Amino acid sequence: MKFVQLPDVQASNPDVMVGLTRVGVTEVKKMVEITRSDKRPIILIPTFDIFVDLPSYRKGANLSRNLEAIDRTLEEALNQPVYRIEDLCVDVAKRLLETHEYASNAEVRMHGEYMMKKKSPKTGLECQEVYDIYADAIVVRGGIIRKTIGAKVIAMTACPCAQEISKETAFKKLAALGVADNVIAEFLDDMPMPTHNQRGVGTIKIESGNDVKVSIEAIIDIIENSMSSQMYELLKREDERYVVHSAHKNPKFVEDCVRTMAKNLVRKFPSLPDDAVITIEQVNEESIHRHNAFAERMATFGELKKEMLSNGPVL
């Protein structure tokens, strides 16, 4: 049987000779097993976006064969132990450059859900909490590698402004009833006044070179502990009382959350290289407004560390 050699249209010249930054596929789902030395492995089903650049002289990237190559690349990478999701992205990007000789760089993005076990604060009930995690890798032919790891966490915030108004009102009311000022102050210190709450959404992303190792669980911990209170999937009444009381004892503006995350990040990762790029973002979903509150800080780690140290010790 004689086979007809079909033309490779994608390898021809395009009508408009313009290079493309990214060509590839998105929403590719794969199962990933994260190996842990002292614990059971974690199973993720993340979504990948996978790209290579396309030179101006090439019409297309042979997407049908490209997808086949990407799928094979992922399968080969996933057959090996995976310890960090960002390193998996780096490995896939390297393999893509081996497959696509015309590309000068490859990029792999990943997002998924990460499950962690957690206990309620007072009764110790165990439950599973879900966190959004992110990883990204860019590999340039010739050896330049940049990778990103990050997480998004939902927790609780309490508004300081409305609380101060409630506190002032309570003080005047109790004083009018004849309660001594020192007794009022002691009461208000122990029983924080009501305020409106927000569901806070905090995000930290750390971009660095290939030799840097950052724990995703440490990032999650930083975000959770930078708001007024953590959230829990399962709470009994004693837990609920504790969470509400704790949040109102620790009121925070959206700006406070970002600044606290920055401080905790510098404290947790003091050995990060100065050229690591840090993105910290907080969105507070308002309960008494139709809008949301937003704050962000982007800086190199060196810039952030210098600014933090100018305020005094952070360790």
From Swiss-Prot:
EC assignment: 3.5.4.39
Annotated TM spans: none
Example of a GO biological process term: tetrahydromethanopterin biosynthetic process
Ranges in coiled-coil conformation: none
Cofactor note: Binds 1 Fe(2+) ion per subunit.
Site (May be catalytically important) location in chain: C159
Catalytic activity, as annotated: GTP + H2O = 7,8-dihydroneopterin 2',3'-cyclic phosphate + formate + diphosphate + H(+)
GO MF annotation terms: GTP cyclohydrolase I activity; GTP cyclohydrolase IV activity; iron ion binding
Keywords linked to the UniProt accession: Hydrolase, Iron, Metal-binding
Cofactor(s) required for function per UniProt: Fe(2+)
InterPro entries recorded: GTP_cyclohydrolase_FolE2/MptA (IPR003801), GTP_cyclohydrolase_MptA (IPR022840)
Sequence similarity: Belongs to the GTP cyclohydrolase IV family.
Protein name: GTP cyclohydrolase MptA 1
Organism: Methanocella arvoryzae (strain DSM 22066 / NBRC 105507 / MRE50)
Chain's gene name: mptA1
